[in-house]
């Protein structure tokens, strides 16, 4: 199985002792989070992503790592120092630095991830914006089903189901249109979010009303007229 671990960058770099969070489990103390990140760095199957937040912890930018290109000078230098079969050091720590590229327009630049493992190539992370108010529709899908990146960004913006009081991880939920696609709703971050199968069915009940507000909040109105609001995830910062 896989574990989705979210850790503040300051904790990973040893600049602060702020807790992380394991999806579906809960908070992780900073020392364990740092150890888990170091262990993940030693596993070549680990997938790395970087999320930029605002001052409140809400996600405003995101990107996932890819190997540095073969023409990258830093990668060539790294490959030239490969240490053969020696095991990686147990205390190796991953680190991020700002890359040379600016990334896509309106984004947050390109970052370089070094895992701290001798001989391991660097990874490149290009961070694109998670548009909020207004939405730029850059990842809008032309049909009913979202693309992989749109689905992923929705799961970053909302780490859990947006149903009131639901805690199911977004990776185990459906991408659901708040304004139905058949009624002209866009397949876009401004009109879709993760809903578990139960809340997906509740939302489709004709006596329930669900609206996504410009700031990303989701307003649920019950048949009795009561209203409940869920907000985009606030990450530890």
Q: Which positions does each model-derived feature cover?
A:
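A boundary/linker detector
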Residues: 1-237
């Amino acid at each position: 199985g896989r574990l989705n671990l979210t850790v503040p960058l300051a904790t990973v770099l040893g600049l602060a002792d702020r807790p992380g969070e394991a999806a579906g489990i809960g908070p992780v103390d900073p020392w364990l989070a740092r150890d888990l990140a170091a262990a993940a760095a030693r596993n070549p199957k680990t997938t790395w992503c970087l999320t930029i937040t605002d001052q409140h912890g809400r996600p405003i930018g995101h990107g996932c790592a890819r190997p540095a290109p073969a023409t990258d000078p830093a990668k060539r230098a790294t490959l030239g120092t490969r240490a053969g079969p020696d095991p990686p050091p147990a205390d190796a720590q991953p680190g991020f630095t700002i890359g040379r590229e600016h990334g896509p327009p309106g984004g947050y630049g390109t970052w370089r991830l070094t895992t701290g493992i001798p001989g391991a190539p660097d990874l490149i992370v290009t961070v694109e914006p998670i548009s909020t108010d207004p939405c730029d529709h850059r990842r809008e899908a032309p049909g009913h089903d979202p693309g992989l990146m749109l689905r992923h960004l929705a799961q970053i913006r909302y780490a859990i189901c947006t149903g009131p009081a639901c805690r199911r991880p977004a990776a185990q939920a459906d991408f659901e249109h708040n304004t139905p696609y058949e009624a002209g709703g866009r397949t876009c971050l401004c009109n879709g979010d993760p809903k578990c199968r139960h809340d997906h069915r509740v939302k489709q009940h004709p006596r329930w009303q669900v609206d996504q507000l410009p700031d990303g909040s989701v307003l649920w109105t019950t048949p009795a007229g009561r209203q409940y609001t869920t907000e985009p995830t606030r990450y530890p910062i």
